[in-house]
Amino acid sequence: MKQKLLILVTMVSMMSCTATQDLPTVEKVELTRYQGLWYEIARLPNSFEKGLDCVTATYTLKSNGKIDVLNRGYSTVKGKYKSARGTARVPDPDEPGKLKVSFFWPFSGNYYILQLDDEYRYALVGDPSRKYLWILSRTKDLDGTVYTSLMEHAKNSGFNTGQVTETGQKCERPDQ
């Protein structure tokens, strides 16, 4: 129940934020290539991931075009994994980099793909309020040059990159 309440508060917060300027996204996303396991390399701190390491997101494309979302992370405080399930969708096919994600109906938040590697090896994801930002990778580590480039793009897009924290990926994962 506490987790649902936390997700509800988070989604309401995300919805209540308004962008001070437009946030450009990638022009093309092939969801069949985007689906799968992503490791969180870094993020802007947020309440729903506080104290979590080894954070992953798994996206599974459904036949109706929606995407199942499974976020997992290891709670360093509780000593166990936490997970949250949701659904994502692309509201406007002309803007495939702008998704809506819902973990608790009827609330949803923005999930904007700001940068995406041509080979779908890494991505920069944020929202127009500039309060949420993630660097994702298909592997647990990301080349330093790529990381720096993504951080520079985030900074130029108006994100407070000085607050970004790296996400540890050194946990024991019994399921992987």
Segments (PLM) and residue ranges:
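A beta-rich soluble binding module of mature secreted/lumenal proteins
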Residues: 17-176
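Sec-dependent N-terminal signal peptides
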Residues: 4-14
